[in-house]
Amino acid sequence: MLAAFTRRTSFLLILLMLVAATQLGWAHAILKDSTPKANSSVTGPDVGITVRFNVRIDGGRSRLHLIAPDGASLPLTIAKQDSPDTLQSQAKGLKPGAYKLIWNVLASDGHMSKGEIPFTVN
C-alpha cells in the first residue's frame, strides 16, 4: 500500500515538474529594448522605430502607433521582420514635442501584450 502511494506521489510530482517546465517557454511578450528608448530625446523630423521583445512576435497581427503632442493617433506601418522578436517602422515628419509609442503585439504564446514608450522629438 505504501509503495503504491509513493509511486503515485512520485508520478504526480514528475508530471507537475514537466508542466511547470513547459510553461516557462510560454511567456508573454516583454519589451527588451527600443529605439527610441523610454523618456529619451531624439532629433526629428524623421525617427526610426525599433522594438525588441523576449519572444517571437507575429508582425502581421501586431500594431504600432504614435500619440502625437496634440493627442492625435498616428498609425505606423511595420516593416518586414528581419528578426522574429523585433518590429521596425519609420515615423516621418514629426514636429517637436512629447510623443508616446504604443505597441500591441501578438506573442508566440498566442497572447496580446501592450505597452507604451514615451519620448520627445527635438
Regions found by a protein language model. Name each.
Residues 27-45:
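N-terminal edge beta-strand
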Residues 83-88:
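Aromatic sugar-binding surface patches on proteins
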Residues 11-22:
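Bacterial N-terminal signal peptides
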Residues 49-74:
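Short, surface-exposed alpha-helix to beta-strand junction/turn motifs within ectodomains of secreted
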